[in-house]
Each structure stands twice: as structure tokens, then as C-alpha cells.
């Protein structure tokens, strides 16, 4: 069992290092105006809180995409309110393309851009979808372990929206 209780003497060497070197910033979020105040470190937790329909999910998608593009992060995503896995991937494609994924009468991604985007999304995002069944936090992280084992990768970040 791993240790979850510490005394200062248990971490005196790392305290000394921290004292000398200071706190290191995490990965760049892709937002210049945000980076002065916020960065993301692997293993840390971020909670995005606001009222209904304020863009929390979209902001989370933007953060995930930027961390994938600029730092190579791989993600496990559970976001049942966004829709089916197809609909979640479509949202991620829209974020990656920075223009509409769906074909419409206005500006839209080309087939070539879409193929490149699908390849990128496929390499960096794994959607966990329990259908109409409940999914516990433990069940989510069991699925993350399964993703890592079956794909021989490490998931760098998880998005659970909402839980």
C-alpha cells in the first residue's frame, strides 16, 4: 500500500530542493492571458465551476486540445451531457479545426483538414461512454487503466464532465 500520510521529515530533501529552485509552472494552456495565473501539471486537479450554459465544457475542451497540441497530452474523457461518442468527437474536431466540422453553406473544413484532424483526435482522445448505465468514479478510472493497458500508453489527463 502506498503511503498517504507524511511528516515534514519524510520530505525534507524535496523541501530543500523546492526552497532553492522554487515552484515550477505546469504546461502552457494555449491561452497567453491565462498562463500568468494558471498552468496545468500532470497529476493535479482542476475544477471548472460556473452556472449552467456558461461554457464550462467548451473551455475544458479548449484546454484539453491545447495541452494535446502543445504538450502531446493524451486524454480520457467522460462527458455524457455532450452526447454520444460521435457527438463528443465532433465537438473535439470543431475545436481542433477552429472552424466548423459539419458541412454547411459557410466556411467549413476541407476533407483533407478533416482527415488530419481525425488522425490527431484519434491519437490523443479516448471517449468513455457508459450508455444509459451509471458510471462511478471507480468505474471511470478502471476504464482509464484499460485504455492504458490495451493501447500501451499513459493517459496524461482526464475530463469528467459533469460528475
Outline where the language-model segments fall:
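The Walker A/P-loop phosphate-binding site
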Residues: 2-99
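Cytosolic-facing regulatory segments adjacent to core modules
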Residues: 32-36, 70-154
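Short glycine-centered, acidic/aromatic-flanked micro-motifs in structured strand/loop junctions
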Residues: 50, 129, 162
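Helical hairpin unit composed of two closely spaced alpha helices linked by a short loop
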Residues: 156-163
